[in-house]
Swiss-Prot record:
Swiss-Prot/TrEMBL catalytic activity: 6-carboxyhexanoyl-[ACP] + L-alanine + H(+) = (8S)-8-amino-7-oxononanoate + holo-[ACP] + CO2
Modified residues (N6-(pyridoxal phosphate)lysine): 242
Species the sequence originates in: Bacillus anthracis
Keywords: Biotin biosynthesis, Pyridoxal phosphate, Transferase
Lineage per the UniProt record: Bacteria, Bacillati, Bacillota, Bacilli, Bacillales
UniProt record similarity statement: Belongs to the class-II pyridoxal-phosphate-dependent aminotransferase family. BioF subfamily.
Name listed for the protein in its UniProt record: Putative 8-amino-7-oxononanoate synthase
Pfam families in the record: Aminotran_1_2
Length: 395
């Protein structure tokens, strides 16, 4: 191997070890279930994004099998060549009906959706205003676009407005935000963001990755809690890989935006389409989340219970108001130690460290699902509290 490269890589890996930021892969089985197997140990699954328990649903499995038998295992090409199966058209129509939008585009992942959409829409003559805690894919899309990047303090509307006020009136403006923040479990102030968008002549993109299938009318997303609000969002992004239990993502909004992305988005143009099996499962999942109110109600209730009990026990869970509940520890060292003890006790509790979260805010990110019982959550809370006291971390 080239020696300068070897030296550089070894130095970087050593730094990651020293900073407590080195990452390993762990073999996991049955991750679609409430209890999983990780490194051959049975654990309560409080780490996955399978929020509605659909990843193991027999109806989705059957839909995927039917489409595999009919269409084969691969799309064979990009959608703009010969990979645009009729399944794509069906799923995109379902998304438009679900979200109340004109046109939709199915893409390969939430990451490629954000990177591709933002870098296609914005250029060096534009300004993008982004919440400081937005997902890495949003940040990378802005960097790739070459646009001026204005980060506003998390959920700080006054700071955002100050930045909008001082922006050149000649420049196009784009505001982008997560709706449910993936590492904090709090939510964006969408109505106020839309008001600022309209006041300063911007457009807005919302990332519904952790809200699609859960919140709003028919689980259409946080922006659909109020119908008139959703109609004022320019572009909605959401994923099929979390609450819907599948894989892939969508972009939807007014036809002109989606037509533009279809023609300009490099992460859409230059990639092989999703396999037919995935599209079959996605179509079934969209049907289920609109009809199965009980799953969504269970998830919201479980989130409320878990948050309230952790707060009562004295844990710092920030401003979480959803099914994503962090316990903020602080240092990498203490977070890794806490995570190790929890896993030894039978809880899949994963340490989240920089650069995923800001420095000095390392945490355990818990995610409850609709399939957890109150007994499951109580069992976990008892062990979390006991271990935290033993380790003298915070309680």
């Amino acid at each position: 191997m080239n020696q300068p490269w070897r030296t550089h890589l070894q130095t970087k890996l050593k730094q990651l070890h020293e900073q407590g930021q080195y990452r390993n892969l762990h073999v996991t089985e049955q991750a679609e279930e409430t209890w999983l197997i990780r490194d051959e140990k049975r654990m309560l699954n409080l780490a996955s994004n399978n929020y509605l328990g659909l990843a193991g649903d027999e109806r989705l499995k059957e839909a995927a099998i039917v489409c595999t038998r009919k269409y084969g295992t691969g799309a064979t090409a990009s959608r703009l060549v010969v990979g645009n199966y009729s399944l794509y058209e069906e799923v995109e129509r379902s998304i438009c009906n679900w979200k109340g939008t004109e046109k939709a585009l199915v893409v390969n992942s939430g990451f490629t959706a954000n990177v591709g959409a933002i870098s296609s829409l914005a250029c060096r003559h534009d300004i993008v205003f982004s919440d400081k805690l937005n997902h890495a894919s949003i940040v990378d899309g802005i960097i790739l676009s070459g646009a001026e990047h204005k980060r506003y303090r998390h959920n700080d509307l006054n700071h955002l407005e100050a930045l909008l006020k001082t922006a050149s009136p000649e420049k196009r403006k784009l505001i982008v935000t997560d709706t449910v923040f993936s590492m904090d479990g709090d939510t964006a102030h969408l109505r106020e963001l839309v008001q600022l968008k309209e006041k300063y002549g911007a457009i807005i993109i919302v990332d519904e990755a952790h809200a699609s299938g859960i919140y709003g009318i028919g689980g259409a997303g946080l922006s659909h809690i109020e119908k008139d609000l959703a109609q004022k969002i320019d572009i909605h992004m959401g994923t099929f890989s979390k609450a819907l239990g599948c894989y892939g993502a969508y972009l939807t909004g007014d036809a002109i935006y989606i037509e533009y992305l279809q023609n300009m988005m490099r992460s859409f143009i230059f990639t092989t389409a999703l396999p037919p099996s995935t599209l079959g499962a996605v179509q079934k999942a969209i049907e289920i989340v609109q009809e199965d109110h009980k799953r969504r109600e269970n998830l919201i209730a479980n989130g409320e219970y878990f948050r309230s009990k952790l707060r009562e026990a004295g844990f710092n869970i920030g401003n979480s108001s959803t099914h994503i509940v962090p316990i903020v520890v602080g240092s990498n060292e203490n977070t890794l130690r806490f995570s190790k003890r929890l896993q030894e006790a039978g809880i899949a509790a994963i340490a989240i460290r920089p650069p995923t979260v800001p420095v000095h805010s390392s945490r355990i990110r818990f995610a409850v699902t609709s399939q957890h019982t109150i007994a499951d959550l109580k069992w976990a809370i008892d062990r979390i509290t006991h271990i935290a006291k033993e380790e003298e971390l915070f309680v």
